[in-house]
Amino acid sequence: MELWIATGNKGKLAEYKQLLRELPDLKVFSQGDIASFTPRPEDGKTFEDNARIKAKTLRAVKNNVWVLGEDAGLVVEGLNGLPGIHSARYAGPKASDSENVSKLLKMITLRPMPNKNAKFVCTTVVYTPTGEEWVFNGEMKGTIASKPAGLHGFGYDPVFIPEGQTQTLAELGTGYKSLLSHRAMALKAFLEKLQTVNP
């Protein structure tokens, strides 16, 4: 079985490959494997909108296979839900992970009584080889640390402390994240449904 993942994000792709490593019959590809692929702008208003845009764009050139589009981001209560769907571009269109993290911490400290409660949200839109659409959601609750810590993961992992933990995701490592992350939860829901149609 082929699964094509609509992402150009190397960190995200590596995470998917890690999460799917125990499925020997599954071959994972991404839009990066298509030389002429041009992604569409992510101009949706929700995570689901953007996940659908990604999946549909890839499916236009790779039909009759499984295609997965995903949008994920960090939702911070004290910032009225920001960075949200703008998580990857929070500090600007070409911002690095560290620039996005710096802006996040700055925006939180500007609040008179910072609310650091947050959650990672992931929505995946999957197209079956016959074109049926499936939608899955996952989330991970936690708080924002006062400064970055840890060397694992990507994005906001160095400042996100999962509920019940004292270390950031970047400190806890890939083993923890692959079991309990927002992405792992959404992917688990997809794989459970896949078992019902492809046992």
UniProtKB/Swiss-Prot annotation:
Belongs to the HAM1 NTPase family. This is dITP/XTP pyrophosphatase. Pfam families: Ham1p_like (PF01725). Keywords: Hydrolase, Magnesium, Metal-binding, Nucleotide metabolism, Nucleotide-binding. The keyword Protease does not apply. The active site is at 71 (proton acceptor). One of its GO terms (cellular component) is cytosol. It catalyses: XTP + H2O = XMP + diphosphate + H(+); dITP + H2O = dIMP + diphosphate + H(+); ITP + H2O = IMP + diphosphate + H(+). Substrate binds at residues 7-12, 72, 154-157, 177, 182-183. It is an enzyme of class 3 (hydrolase). GO terms for biological process: nucleotide metabolic process; purine nucleoside triphosphate catabolic process. Mg(2+) binds at residue 71. Pyrophosphatase that catalyzes the hydrolysis of nucleoside triphosphates to their monophosphate derivatives, with a high preference for the non-canonical purine nucleotides XTP (xanthosine triphosphate), dITP (deoxyinosine triphosphate) and ITP. Seems to function as a house-cleaning enzyme that removes non-canonical purine nucleotides from the nucleotide pool, thus preventing their incorporation into DNA/RNA and avoiding chromosomal lesions. One of its GO terms (molecular function) is ITP diphosphatase activity. Its EC number is 3.6.1.66. Homodimer. Its cofactor is Mg(2+). Binds 1 Mg(2+) ion per subunit.
